[in-house]
Amino acid sequence: MHNVNILTIHKEPNYGAVLQAYALYKTIENLGHVPYIINLDMDYSRFPYSLKYRVLLGLHKWMKGYSHCFALAERFSRKHCPNQIGNFHTTAELESYPWNKDDYYLIGSDQVWNLGITQNLRTAFCFSFLKNDVKNRYAYAASFGNIKDEERRKSELDMKALSLFKRIAVREKFGVEFLQRNGIDAVEVI
């Protein structure tokens, strides 16, 4: 039995994000391991538009509903994925946590490498905050989303950290090809 620390997008106002996190958590648990969600709070995504933009477009009513959806997602996550580590907001906070080098670390299964979603936390989703002696790094059904700009991906993702993964499975064929062109072995999963 191993501790499996999962870094994913798990409490966004999006049923797909919430349910994929729950499904992965339960699958790890059903395989006889102890899952933990790394609780990385992506604050910026709660208010993706400037106040001026929201007011001009009348989005203030929309934002009330949006905030309610966040609360529901967080409540679901706490109830159905109770093992959660920390309340991190930055890569620096993740770096200062005493991660166990013998645990397993799993990224996925969502658009964790979509630069438009992960924004200032994009390197965290490559496990850049783990020390090099952590050997059990995996990615399952990680997605680049629709970001097909290879130069942007190469410059903004932590390719060195990705090269330390034992196994990587991604959703897109272009993602497999991108990783392989950069010396990182990957397979496609659906």
Where are these regions (language model features)?
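Aromatic- and Gly/Pro-rich donor/ligand-binding loops
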Residues: 4-15, 19-160
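An acidic- and aromatic-residue-enriched active-site/binding cleft used to recognize and process polar
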Residues: 9, 40, 173-174, 184
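Alpha-helix N-cap/helix-start capping motif
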Residues: 22, 172-173
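Conserved dinucleotide-binding and phosphotransfer motif residues
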Residues: 31, 164, 182
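A short beta-strand/loop micro-motif in the catalytic core of glycosyltransferases
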Residues: 165-172
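Helix-loop-beta element that forms the nucleotide-linked donor phosphate-binding surface
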Residues: 176-190
